[in-house]
Amino acid sequence: MGNYLSVNDTDRKLMLEKIGTSDLMELYRDVPADLILKEPLSLPEGKAEMQVRKFMRQLSAENKVYPVIFRGAGAYRHYIPAIVDQVASKETFLTAYTPYQPEISQGILQSIFEYQTMICELTGMDVSNATVYDGATAAAEAAAMCRDRRRNTVLVSEAVNPETIEVVKTYCWAAGTKVVMVPASAGVTDIGALRDLINAETAAVLIQNPNYFGCLEHAEEIVEVTHGAKAKVIMSVDPIAAAILKTPREYGADIAVGEGQPLGMPLSYGGPYLGFMAATKEMMRKLPGRIVGETTDDRGNKAYVLTLQAREQHIRREKASSNICSNEALCALRAAVYMAAMGRNGMREAASQCVSKAHYLQKQLEEAGFTRKYEGEFFHEFVTDSPYPAAQVNAVLDKHDILGGLELPDGSILWCVTECNTKEEIDRMVSILKEELA
């Protein structure tokens, strides 16, 4: 069995001479000294491929794969039609990067264009980009789109996913943009607090609908208050919920963002996912990343091109609207195939099942002594107060290979149901809780 031959000292010397230096550390001169490794990493001796494969199998076997899941909080188990994997695994698509001459790859560009078209239909917006890294990144990029010299403050609802909030804060910190949190009350954004906090320096207000607690926001009222202060509304949405709810544009949002993982991406231990972004025509030139457009070639045939490239880093460098470079085209392809395979009726059916099954679980949990924490409408997630410690509830379910809801900081539990959960699974879980926690 062959061995991997790494770069040796002679190779390093030749490469350094080629670029005109003899000191490897010269290449790291811009890296702060305290971040540079002082000694080589202490690594074990190399192993043969067969030994490595055996070790990796043993390591992966330590993961617990749950056949039944009642947890969401940003990553959701939805059914993925077989055609999604079949198309995405084709060697013509299965690549990490768009070719350097993208117009040569009309198939890839067409798939991205169709993805953009369907995202616009789903959100009601005028234009979509070719995705960013994930939903949190999309929200942060949207915040960056809205700021200008006069307006450099972003208001973020406390009902937004906490991980999204952290990413937005990081982006805004680097850009010198101020982030102000808007309190949540009764599981939704506090409109009164929003009125008190918004001012002439506010660039945008970020909300999530349905929000982190599963509740539907009073979106129209939030939009009215925000636009009254001449600020922009960024609405983070669940793409499955968007199939049956009003679109962000119908609510009056200026930018729609969200986590695209439910659109054909497996949970996959957190990634790769995709962040979708769509906006009104007025915001189009501030959208980050690639945008594919449709045109005609010199023979009059339909053709696809990368358009509005003056926004991108390979044209404007440090003045670009974004520095997204690693391509999410494969994830966008999966999302496009998923939406095309499901169709309008299929996505509405999946969303409707999410709603009905989640409400069924809520009623069953109430019979088991759990109480819903927040009133109002919800999609497929909701929060309950538990008569037992949340950790104990999940420990009991774990023994039966069921992943329970997410324990929140106040001890309540955030539950999630999708079309993949059956009535039998719900009844079994509730029965286990009644029997073993009584």
Residue spans for each PLM region:
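Gly-rich Lys/Arg/Thr-decorated short loops/hinges at beta-loop-alpha junctions or inter-strand turns
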Residues: E91-P102, M118-G124, R150-R151, C172-V180, ...
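N-terminal entrance/gating region of PLP-dependent enzymes' catalytic architecture
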Residues: I36-F113
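Active-site C-terminal subdomain of aminotransferase-like
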Residues: L263-A368, R372-E375
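Compact, charge-rich alpha-helical regulatory domains located at protein termini
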Residues: M1-M25, R29-L35
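Conserved PLP-enzyme active-site core in the AAT-like
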Residues: M15, T137-G300, A368-G369, K373, ...
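Short loop-beta-helix segment that forms the pyridoxal 5′-phosphate
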Residues: Y100-I104, C120-A140
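Buried hydrophobic packing segments
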Residues: Q116-I119, A138-C146, A335-M339
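Conserved C-terminal alpha-helix-loop-beta "cap" of PLP-dependent enzymes
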Residues: N345-R428
